[in-house]
Amino acid sequence: MEFVTAGSKKIKVQHDSWMDGGGTWFGQEYIDIIQQRYPDRVFEKCYEWCSGPAFIGFGILDQALCKSLCVSDIYADAIKSVEETVRVNFLSNVSAYATGTVAGLPEHEKFDLVVANPPHFLECPGDDNYQRIAVDQDWAAHQEFFKNIGQHLLPGGIILLQENQAGSMNREKDFEPFIAKAGLEITAVIDSPQHYTPDHYTQIYYIEIRQK
């Protein structure tokens, strides 16, 4: 399957249907949020955590909001899709890693923008495929992310995570202890203009995080 980004290059993102955890839907709102919050800024390197086939990252790259892109995902098949996207679109400014942890990234990888549509739920009904995309038990993946991402942030770097209040019912407060322990701080919380619907399973919001 192909998902075509909306920028000038119209990057053809290669993927299987099971890999889409919302990246082709509410994930594409990232473009507007970044353009509105950081007007006229072009980031040196964007990192998409829990990338899947990198619908979000390739969209940001195609809109020229970053000069280069790094992605990682626990599933090797997702990273193979990223590599195929790089090949068919003749891209030379993308790095991709099959790892389930930020600690698994090479030390040299540094970013000034970090984005993600990570697993949003501690638990939720659904088949095995949905479970592996949607569930982060005990927020273990989030805890590991916050613990290790700081060493990869460039000065002035921004973390902008896309979360779902239907899963993190206390919103950013569910993650505040992990963020503070890592020497980071929340600088903004933004409700999705298009995909925040109270009492619905899509209650998307964004957490902006920076180094203290």
Report residues per predicted region.
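Conserved SAM/SAH cofactor-binding pocket of Class I
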Residues: 26-107, 113-116, 122
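Short, conserved glycine- and acidic-residue-centered signature motifs
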Residues: 19-27, 49, 138-142
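Short hydrophobic/aromatic beta-strand or adjacent loop that forms the aromatic wall/cage
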Residues: 200-208
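Class I SAM-dependent transferase core
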Residues: 1-38
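Alpha-helix N-cap/loop-to-helix initiation residues
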Residues: 19-20, 78, 167-169
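Mobile active-site "lid"/loop adjacent to the S-adenosyl-L-methionine
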Residues: 118-144
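Conserved Class I SAM-dependent methyltransferase catalytic core
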Residues: 141-194, 199-201
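Class I S-adenosyl-L-methionine-dependent methyltransferase catalytic core
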Residues: 76, 80-83, 88, 104, ...
